[in-house]
């Protein structure tokens, strides 16, 4: 018999009754029922119940064991009586009568429990992640992560993509987030950077004659953490294709993403044909470029009802600014003063002056609007609003006014809040959509210059003619995002493969030819030697797994993540290094400035 086990802890069944078995694992819990000891023995695969009575030669040893000790058990497989069968366990019809027990390893007092999975402070969980990962939910999340990544690889290979591994030490690129810098010992004073994404390398692969590339790529960005973004590093499904237009990429990747969600959705419906929304449409209807389409609320422009109206606040806003609009956020079933006042209070807590509203009641077969706005604009305008928005008895509507460019973030947040408060959001589905036609540039008011709105390497719609003839702020890019349930899960574009257009694009953003050659020299040179039209995308693996597992925090689906302060509490990183190491690198740490 094997030194440690003949079976794992989820293997034995009723058909194995009578055989001798050897199991090894962790003591999940110990119970004493009238002098008979029961041990739930756990390993990677599952749990088996071990039994020892005072007549068992193993009894005295089992009396000593505690939670999370590692033991080996030899014994006989016995059937449980009908009244004690545990239908929640695959091994619930049997138990092992222990005849010999060996203690392989003891455990100190646990800083957090493994059995029962109560809520525990996250920093404790991360410091003792090896214990946290023993818990059933975390173990299941990590195993599901592995299964999802394996399914991605299988699907990509079935669709003709080849996996390539790109370098992890590369040049710093100041665009986007901050780089993690790695000092060079050999070339002192110079630095490598960990890649924020394999963007240039995957394009260079297309220049090198390869056709369809993918990689489960580690990416590194020195940015502030949040629940849907891991500090430090994350993984993305990186994709690039040669000789393609935007339609080719979308048509290729949509069934791959749909089948991935269907495989791991646990029966929840998945969008079969992903709708396509322009960036402008998404912002106008939902106040977000990553709308949650499970929320049925669609915002509408209702400005015409407020021009020269009795509600002077909105009327004056419209009269004083030609860009001003009034948008409505319909709230089905939200027609109570208590709810409307609660939303108004929430808006004030968000730094807004308030959130105007109307709610409707049916009196003697006639709809009447209630609230200050209805009172001021009058019955006719109130009824016209209701008809435009398709609202009925017991419904409400909230309003935001001003320049949409300024109020959009709040309007989108208000739409989300209303949908959640009124339980309008369908939690049991995955709603996916493409967002297309992103603006190429945006205006940086602080620095009085153009910034790239999305990806600087994308192709402008209209090509060279558009670059030369159009107002840069009206340019659209061949860029697209894939969104799901309010999260951006993928982003991509058709690349600019012309060196002349590349220089023109960067010049509009204030970067000279010399700067482009310095920062993107490898890619720029490659464009001069026969660059194929190409495009691709990158999907956030961690975020997709988070959605499929139904958790709100990426750290619940990552093995050894940092905490919110970008600290690895398990490995004590970042850490001090020795003076010798610094000297070898030619680095001196400047003392931190004191705050007077």
Swiss-Prot record:
SUPFAM superfamilies: Class II aaRS and biotin synthetases, GAD domain-like, Nucleic acid-binding proteins. GO terms for cellular component: cytoplasm. It comes from Bartonella henselae (strain ATCC 49882 / DSM 28221 / CCUG 30454 / Houston 1) (Rochalimaea henselae). GO terms for biological process: aspartyl-tRNA aminoacylation. Signal peptide: none annotated. Homodimer. It comes from the Bacteria. The lineage of its organism: Bacteria, Pseudomonadati, Pseudomonadota, Alphaproteobacteria, Hyphomicrobiales. It holds the Pfam family GAD. ATP binds at residues 221-223, 488, 540-543. This is Aspartate--tRNA(Asp/Asn) ligase.
């Amino acid at each position: 018999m094997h030194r440690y086990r003949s079976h794992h802890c989820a293997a034995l069944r009723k058909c194995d009754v009578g055989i001798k078995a050897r199991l090894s694992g962790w003591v999940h819990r110990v119970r004493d029922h009238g002098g008979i000891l029961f041990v739930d023995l756990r390993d990677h695969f599952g749990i088996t119940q071990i039994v020892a009575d005072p007549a068992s030669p193993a009894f005295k040893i089992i009396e000593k064991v505690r939670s999370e000790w590692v033991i080996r058990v030899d014994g006989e497989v016995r059937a449980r009586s009908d009244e004690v069968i545990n239908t929640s366990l695959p091994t619930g019809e049997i138990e092992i009568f222990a005849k010999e027990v060996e203690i392989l390893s003891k455990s100190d007092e646990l800083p957090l429990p493994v059995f029962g999975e109560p809520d525990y402070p996250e920093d404790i969980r991360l410091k003792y992640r090896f214990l946290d990962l023993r818990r059933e939910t975390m173990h299941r999340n990590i195993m599901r992560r592995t299964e999802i990544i394996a399914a991605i690889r299988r699907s990509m290979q079935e669709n003709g993509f080849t996996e390539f591994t790109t370098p992890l030490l590369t040049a710093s690129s100041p665009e986007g987030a901050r780089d993690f810098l790695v000092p060079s010992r050999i070339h002192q004073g110079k630095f490598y950077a960990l890649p924020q994404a394999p963007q240039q390398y995957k394009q260079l692969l297309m220049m090198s004659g390869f056709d369809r590339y993918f990689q489960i790529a580690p990416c590194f960005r020195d940015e502030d953490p949040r629940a849907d973004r891991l500090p430090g590093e994350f993984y993305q499904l990186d994709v690039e294709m040669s000789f393609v237009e935007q339609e080719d990429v979308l048509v290729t990747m949509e069934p791959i993403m749909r089948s991935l969600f269907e495989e791991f959705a646990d029966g929840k419906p998945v969008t079969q044909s992903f709708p396509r929304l322009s960036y402008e449409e998404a912002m106008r209807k939902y106040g977000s470029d990553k709308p949650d389409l499970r929320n049925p609320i669609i915002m509408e422009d209702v400005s015409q009802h407020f021009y020269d109206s009795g509600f002077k606040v909105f009327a004056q806003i419209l009269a004083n600014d030609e860009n001003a609009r009034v948008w409505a956020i319909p709230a089905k079933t939200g027609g109570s003063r208590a709810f409307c006042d609660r939303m108004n209070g929430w808006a004030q807590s968000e730094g807004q002056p308030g959130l105007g509203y109307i709610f409707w009641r049916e009196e003697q077969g006639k709809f009447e609007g209630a609230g200050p706005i209805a009172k001021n604009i009058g019955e006719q305008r109130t009824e016209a609003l209701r008809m435009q928005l398709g609202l009925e008895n017991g419904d409400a509507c909230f309003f935001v006014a001003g320049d949409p460019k300024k109020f959009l973030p709040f309007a989108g947040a208000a739409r989300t809040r209303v949908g959640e408060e009124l339980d309008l959001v369908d939690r049991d589905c995955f709603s996916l959509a493409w967002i297309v036609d992103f603006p190429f540039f945006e205006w940086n008011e602080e620095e009085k210059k153009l910034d790239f709105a999305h990806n600087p390497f994308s192709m402008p719609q209209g090509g060279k003619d558009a670059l030369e003839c159009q107002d840069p702020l009206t340019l659209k890019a061949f860029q697209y995002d894939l969104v799901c349930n309010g999260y951006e899960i993928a982003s991509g574009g058709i690349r600019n493969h012309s060196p002349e257009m590349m220089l023109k694009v960067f010049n509009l953003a204030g970067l000279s030819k010399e700067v482009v050659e310095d920062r993107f020299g490898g890619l720029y040179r490659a464009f001069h030697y026969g660059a194929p039209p190409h495009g691709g995308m990158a999907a956030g693996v961690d975020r997709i797994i988070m959605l499929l597992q139904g958790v709100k925090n990426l750290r619940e689906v990552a093995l050894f993540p940092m905490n919110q302060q970008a600290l690895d509490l398990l490995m004590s990183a970042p850490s001090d290094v020795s003076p010798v190491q610094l000297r070898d690198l030619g680095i001196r740490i400047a003392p931190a400035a004191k705050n007077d």
